Amino acid sequence: MKISAIIISRNDNYGGHLNERATYAINSAINTYDEVIYVDWNSPTHSLLWDIKDNLQLNGNLKHFIIPPDAAKSLTNYNEHAQLCCEVLARNIGIRRATGDYIISTNIDIIHPKREDIESIINNSDNNTMFTLSRREVTWDIIKEFHGGEMNFQEWDKLRDYIYINSEERVQNEATVTGDNYSIINCCGDFQLAPKHIWNEIKGFEEELIYPLYADTNVQKKSVKHGFNLKAIFNPPMFHINHGSKGWGGGGFAEGINKKANDIHQAVTFQEQTKNPTTWGFSNIEIEYEIL
């Protein structure tokens, strides 16, 4: 069984301490999954990965894609309101090129579960279900206290062992709009797991939704509309490193970083099966990457 994880970001220090959060996240992903795809989208100067590379425990399973600003503008049809880190397009680039039997769409600030726990979810599933895993919060105060007053990226695994047994399930339901039976948990986009055939059938994330908000709920509704099951998982834990910002769509809509949001009714109320083209994820374009 091969498991791939897709992580996206932009080198803009969104939420603060982005490099530090990314280091914990990517190290844990490298450890848990067979393949980790990092897509750096629209970074103003250089990929975030270059800033943290020296603190990563690389072992040859990290694929690094860079979509520079000029390419990002072209791929969003020069829409001035497109999300600065355009999640749906960046995720689809990774999902379309992932080689795993199971694919996880996740975020840059997540400390990932242990391998055996992910395998347990998969082995107890029916191969026709999309899962969303509920996060638990971990703060910098907790991290620094555990490490003796500082950050210790090389002992991320010891930190994970500690917070595994010193945290509680976070059961927080969510409905974005009347009739939303698809979000099922708060922040459902932190960790979405499905067999590759489901991602292929629904053609990844809906590529019209190039603004912040609702794309994660949308992809879960699409899975149901295509005849698949949807389930929330509250244990095993995965951990969101709290950055203290309002968030709202992974791109700072609440803070005004992005000025326009996806329409909630287009994304949730009226979504049926996918409208993505067969070339979703820009499969008709060869995008270079490096393996680290």
What positions do the PLM features span?
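Short beta-strand-to-loop acidic/aromatic patch adjacent to the donor-nucleotide binding site
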Residues: G100-P113
